[in-house]
Amino acid sequence: MTTTIRLALGAAAMVLATIPYLAFAQAPPAPAQPQAPPQPMGFFISSVGVGDGANLGGLAGADKHCQALAVAAGAGTRTWRAYLSAAAAAGQPPVNARDRIGSGPWYNAKGVVMAWNVAELHGDLERDRNNVRKPTALNEKGQEVNGVGNQPNQHDILTGSDSHGRAMLGAANTTTCGNWTSNAEGRAMLGHHDRLGGANASWNAVHLSSGCSQANLVATGGAGLLYCFAVN
Protein backbone atom coordinates (compact mmCIF):
# COMPACT_ATOMS: atom_id res chain seq x y z
CA MET A 1 0.00 0.00 0.00
CA THR A 2 2.75 2.39 0.97
CA THR A 3 4.65 1.55 -2.21
CA THR A 4 1.54 2.20 -4.29
CA ILE A 5 1.03 5.61 -2.67
CA ARG A 6 4.65 6.52 -3.25
CA LEU A 7 4.42 5.58 -6.93
CA ALA A 8 1.23 7.59 -7.32
CA LEU A 9 2.79 10.63 -5.67
CA GLY A 10 5.89 10.32 -7.85
CA ALA A 11 3.81 10.16 -11.01
CA ALA A 12 1.82 13.20 -9.92
CA ALA A 13 5.02 15.12 -9.25
CA MET A 14 6.28 14.31 -12.74
CA VAL A 15 3.06 15.54 -14.29
CA LEU A 16 3.21 18.77 -12.29
CA ALA A 17 6.84 19.29 -13.31
CA THR A 18 5.95 19.05 -16.99
CA ILE A 19 3.08 21.54 -16.83
CA PRO A 20 5.26 24.69 -17.05
CA TYR A 21 7.19 23.17 -19.96
CA LEU A 22 4.00 22.28 -21.81
CA ALA A 23 2.57 25.72 -21.18
CA PHE A 24 5.76 27.31 -22.52
CA ALA A 25 5.91 24.98 -25.51
CA GLN A 26 2.29 25.65 -26.44
CA ALA A 27 2.43 29.41 -25.92
CA PRO A 28 1.81 31.36 -29.15
CA PRO A 29 4.86 33.10 -30.62
CA ALA A 30 5.31 36.76 -29.83
CA PRO A 31 4.09 39.03 -32.62
CA ALA A 32 6.83 40.21 -34.98
CA GLN A 33 8.04 43.73 -34.36
CA PRO A 34 7.38 46.09 -37.26
CA GLN A 35 10.51 46.86 -39.29
CA ALA A 36 11.46 50.45 -39.94
CA PRO A 37 11.18 51.28 -43.64
CA PRO A 38 14.56 51.47 -45.41
CA GLN A 39 15.99 54.94 -45.83
CA PRO A 40 15.93 56.15 -49.44
CA MET A 41 19.25 56.43 -51.21
CA GLY A 42 20.60 59.98 -51.17
CA PHE A 43 24.25 59.42 -52.04
CA PHE A 44 26.21 57.38 -54.54
CA ILE A 45 29.37 57.35 -56.60
CA SER A 46 28.57 57.16 -60.29
CA SER A 47 29.20 53.66 -61.59
CA VAL A 48 30.53 55.18 -64.82
CA GLY A 49 31.83 58.56 -65.85
CA VAL A 50 30.50 60.64 -68.71
CA GLY A 51 33.28 59.15 -70.83
CA ASP A 52 34.84 62.34 -72.19
CA GLY A 53 37.39 62.97 -69.48
CA ALA A 54 36.54 66.00 -67.37
CA ASN A 55 34.33 67.46 -70.08
CA LEU A 56 31.05 66.82 -68.33
CA GLY A 57 29.04 69.44 -70.15
CA GLY A 58 29.51 71.85 -67.25
CA LEU A 59 27.71 71.52 -63.95
CA ALA A 60 24.41 71.01 -65.75
CA GLY A 61 25.80 68.07 -67.71
CA ALA A 62 27.22 66.49 -64.57
CA ASP A 63 23.89 66.87 -62.77
CA LYS A 64 22.13 65.27 -65.73
CA HIS A 65 24.52 62.32 -65.54
CA CYS A 66 23.80 61.79 -61.84
CA GLN A 67 20.06 62.07 -62.45
CA ALA A 68 20.13 59.51 -65.28
CA LEU A 69 22.00 56.98 -63.15
CA ALA A 70 19.58 57.55 -60.28
CA VAL A 71 16.62 56.97 -62.61
CA ALA A 72 18.14 53.70 -63.81
CA ALA A 73 18.58 52.63 -60.17
CA GLY A 74 14.97 53.42 -59.29
CA ALA A 75 15.77 56.63 -57.38
CA GLY A 76 14.74 59.10 -60.04
CA THR A 77 11.95 60.71 -58.02
CA ARG A 78 14.59 62.72 -56.17
CA THR A 79 16.61 65.63 -57.58
CA TRP A 80 20.28 64.76 -57.91
CA ARG A 81 23.36 66.97 -58.14
CA ALA A 82 26.99 66.23 -58.82
CA TYR A 83 29.36 67.15 -56.01
CA LEU A 84 31.42 69.67 -58.01
CA SER A 85 32.65 73.20 -57.50
CA ALA A 86 33.17 75.72 -60.30
CA ALA A 87 35.59 78.63 -60.45
CA ALA A 88 34.58 82.24 -60.99
CA ALA A 89 34.43 82.90 -64.73
CA ALA A 90 32.81 85.23 -67.26
CA GLY A 91 31.64 87.56 -64.52
CA GLN A 92 29.94 84.75 -62.59
CA PRO A 93 30.87 84.02 -58.95
CA PRO A 94 32.37 80.69 -57.92
CA VAL A 95 30.09 77.78 -57.10
CA ASN A 96 30.77 75.64 -54.04
CA ALA A 97 30.01 71.93 -54.15
CA ARG A 98 28.79 72.02 -50.56
CA ASP A 99 26.10 74.54 -51.51
CA ARG A 100 24.64 72.36 -54.27
CA ILE A 101 23.73 69.15 -52.47
CA GLY A 102 20.90 69.93 -50.08
CA SER A 103 21.03 69.70 -46.30
CA GLY A 104 21.10 65.94 -45.63
CA PRO A 105 20.97 63.42 -44.18
CA TRP A 106 22.23 61.21 -47.01
CA TYR A 107 22.11 57.41 -47.08
CA ASN A 108 23.84 55.02 -49.45
CA ALA A 109 22.09 52.36 -51.54
CA LYS A 110 21.99 50.00 -48.55
CA GLY A 111 20.53 52.49 -46.11
CA VAL A 112 23.77 53.37 -44.30
CA VAL A 113 24.02 57.02 -43.32
CA MET A 114 26.93 58.86 -44.97
CA ALA A 115 26.51 62.16 -43.14
CA TRP A 116 23.71 63.84 -41.23
CA ASN A 117 24.28 67.31 -42.62
CA VAL A 118 26.64 69.52 -44.62
CA ALA A 119 28.74 70.44 -41.59
CA GLU A 120 29.34 66.81 -40.64
CA LEU A 121 30.10 65.87 -44.24
CA HIS A 122 32.88 68.45 -44.35
CA GLY A 123 34.14 68.22 -40.79
CA ASP A 124 33.29 71.82 -39.98
CA LEU A 125 33.08 71.09 -36.26
CA GLU A 126 35.08 67.86 -36.05
CA ARG A 127 37.16 66.29 -38.79
CA ASP A 128 36.44 62.87 -40.30
CA ARG A 129 32.92 62.55 -38.97
CA ASN A 130 31.39 61.45 -42.27
CA ASN A 131 31.13 57.88 -43.53
CA VAL A 132 32.66 58.32 -46.98
CA ARG A 133 34.90 55.26 -47.10
CA LYS A 134 35.33 52.37 -49.48
CA PRO A 135 32.94 49.90 -47.75
CA THR A 136 30.15 52.50 -47.62
CA ALA A 137 30.77 54.89 -50.53
CA LEU A 138 28.85 52.64 -52.92
CA ASN A 139 27.68 53.27 -56.45
CA GLU A 140 24.01 53.60 -57.37
CA LYS A 141 23.79 49.81 -57.76
CA GLY A 142 24.93 49.21 -54.20
CA GLN A 143 28.36 48.00 -55.29
CA GLU A 144 31.78 48.91 -53.94
CA VAL A 145 33.87 51.14 -56.18
CA ASN A 146 37.40 49.99 -56.98
CA GLY A 147 40.15 51.54 -54.90
CA VAL A 148 43.75 50.89 -53.97
CA GLY A 149 44.43 47.16 -54.32
CA ASN A 150 41.80 46.65 -57.03
CA GLN A 151 42.31 46.49 -60.76
CA PRO A 152 41.72 48.97 -62.16
CA ASN A 153 42.07 51.44 -59.33
CA GLN A 154 39.30 54.06 -59.69
CA HIS A 155 39.50 55.92 -56.40
CA ASP A 156 40.05 59.35 -57.99
CA ILE A 157 36.70 61.16 -57.84
CA LEU A 158 36.25 64.52 -59.59
CA THR A 159 35.38 67.36 -57.20
CA GLY A 160 37.19 70.60 -58.10
CA SER A 161 36.89 71.47 -54.41
CA ASP A 162 38.96 72.05 -51.31
CA SER A 163 38.45 69.86 -48.26
CA HIS A 164 35.60 72.08 -47.07
CA GLY A 165 33.72 71.66 -50.34
CA ARG A 166 34.44 75.13 -51.68
CA ALA A 167 35.78 76.30 -55.02
CA MET A 168 39.53 76.78 -55.02
CA LEU A 169 41.37 79.96 -55.95
CA GLY A 170 42.66 80.28 -59.48
CA ALA A 171 41.44 80.13 -63.03
CA ALA A 172 38.85 77.58 -64.08
CA ASN A 173 41.38 75.45 -65.96
CA THR A 174 43.62 74.98 -62.90
CA THR A 175 41.24 72.98 -60.67
CA THR A 176 38.02 72.29 -62.64
CA CYS A 177 39.14 71.59 -66.22
CA GLY A 178 37.52 74.77 -67.50
CA ASN A 179 34.52 74.39 -65.20
CA TRP A 180 33.98 70.87 -66.46
CA THR A 181 34.01 71.69 -70.17
CA SER A 182 37.53 70.59 -71.16
CA ASN A 183 38.91 67.21 -72.15
CA ALA A 184 42.32 68.60 -73.09
CA GLU A 185 44.32 71.26 -71.26
CA GLY A 186 43.85 71.96 -67.58
CA ARG A 187 43.64 70.05 -64.35
CA ALA A 188 40.98 69.03 -61.83
CA MET A 189 41.06 68.50 -58.09
CA LEU A 190 40.33 64.91 -57.10
CA GLY A 191 39.29 63.14 -53.91
CA HIS A 192 39.83 59.51 -52.84
CA HIS A 193 36.70 57.65 -51.81
CA ASP A 194 38.80 54.94 -50.14
CA ARG A 195 40.85 57.47 -48.12
CA LEU A 196 44.07 55.80 -49.33
CA GLY A 197 47.03 57.21 -51.23
CA GLY A 198 48.66 60.58 -50.83
CA ALA A 199 49.69 62.41 -47.69
CA ASN A 200 46.19 63.86 -47.30
CA ALA A 201 43.76 60.96 -47.62
CA SER A 202 40.72 63.18 -48.08
CA TRP A 203 37.50 62.05 -49.71
CA ASN A 204 37.19 65.28 -51.68
CA ALA A 205 40.61 66.96 -52.04
CA VAL A 206 43.81 64.93 -52.41
CA HIS A 207 45.62 65.89 -55.61
CA LEU A 208 45.21 67.40 -59.06
CA SER A 209 44.75 65.34 -62.19
CA SER A 210 47.56 65.24 -64.73
CA GLY A 211 45.19 66.63 -67.34
CA CYS A 212 41.57 66.65 -68.43
CA SER A 213 41.39 63.84 -70.98
CA GLN A 214 39.97 60.41 -70.19
CA ALA A 215 43.48 58.98 -70.49
CA ASN A 216 44.77 61.55 -68.01
CA LEU A 217 42.12 60.61 -65.47
CA VAL A 218 42.75 56.88 -65.86
CA ALA A 219 46.52 57.34 -65.56
CA THR A 220 46.34 58.53 -61.94
CA GLY A 221 43.75 56.02 -60.75
CA GLY A 222 40.39 57.30 -61.88
CA ALA A 223 37.64 56.96 -64.46
CA GLY A 224 35.95 60.36 -64.32
CA LEU A 225 33.57 59.22 -61.57
CA LEU A 226 31.42 61.64 -59.56
CA TYR A 227 29.89 61.88 -56.13
CA CYS A 228 26.12 62.32 -56.54
CA PHE A 229 23.83 63.68 -53.80
CA ALA A 230 20.06 64.04 -53.58
CA VAL A 231 19.08 67.60 -52.70
CA ASN A 232 15.55 66.75 -51.49
What do these predicted regions represent?
Residues M1-T3, A17, P135, L158:
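Intrinsically disordered/low-complexity terminal segments and short unstructured peptides
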Residues M1-A12:
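Bacterial N-terminal signal peptides that target proteins for export
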